[in-house]
UniProtKB/Swiss-Prot annotation:
Belongs to the HIBADH-related family. It comes from Escherichia coli (strain K12). NAD(+) binds at residues 4-18, 94, 237. One of its GO terms (molecular function) is 2-hydroxy-3-oxopropionate reductase activity. The gene is glxR. GO terms for biological process: allantoin assimilation pathway; DNA damage response; glycolate catabolic process; glyoxylate catabolic process. InterPro entries: 3-OH-isobutyrate_DH-rel_CS, 6-PGluconate_DH-like_C_sf, 6PGD_dom2, 6PGDH_NADP-bd, HIBADH-like_NADP-bd, HIBADH-related, NAD(P)-bd_dom_sf, Tartro_sem_red. The lineage of its organism: Bacteria, Pseudomonadati, Pseudomonadota, Gammaproteobacteria, Enterobacterales. This is 2-hydroxy-3-oxopropionate reductase.
Amino acid sequence: MKLGFIGLGIMGTPMAINLARAGHQLHVTTIGPVADELLSLGAVSVETARQVTEASDIIFIMVPDTPQVEEVLFGENGCTKASLKGKTIVDMSSISPIETKRFARQVNELGGDYLDAPVSGGEIGAREGTLSIMVGGDEAVFERVKPLFELLGKNITLVGGNGDGQTCKVANQIIVALNIEAVSEALLFASKAGADPVRVRQALMGGFASSRILEVHGERMIKRTFNPGFKIALHQKDLNLALQSAKALALNLPNTATCQELFNTCAANGGSQLDHSALVQALELMANHKLA
């Protein structure tokens, strides 16, 4: 099957590699250089999203935010400048659910199919092919693309119609942010009280407080390893989507708003490109105490 992939960053590169390893011919485009491993697997690098679309049956998009997806789709050399008849656009970025519905409608009007399929699992999940994939769109289109999703992830769910995948991802990001904040508070509390955070985390991992966030991000906080698997700047973007959507729904998300303020503090102190586990640094600043 002829596939296209647009956006080869921290997540997109390993995802595209997994598709290429399965024997699929890929045409790709990205802002920076294409990884040598991907080229060695036969991927063809082209200049524009239009060229990717012309050469492909199914086109995957993995870019940072809503404006970038809109440019990829509808820009001067975007996907929609090629014929979309018989083609499927699969947007795996994390973007606005409201705009996603508009994008899907416009692609459908031009004869193409559209799935929104944001992911969770970070760089590790992308590399290992264990992502959780939350899909919005037509069931028949989902079933057609599902074998490709299975090369990228393990927990693959058709949530509902177009936009529902993105809504699910926003909910996911709320939960992840609040859990990172909770782990940060707990370990910082233990550390300032004089306990060893390494041993506290070890004890908590055996009880009801155990979680993937405590396992992975708790370790990063203790070891001070904040190289980005998922950048604070991107989580700020996701929580902005949550808060904007909540406002439209006349819904209060008080703890989400608090987490966003903590991410904003990190960003204001030069941490926007750090891993989101570095949220702990905002709490450390207020406590005048480093966890480790």
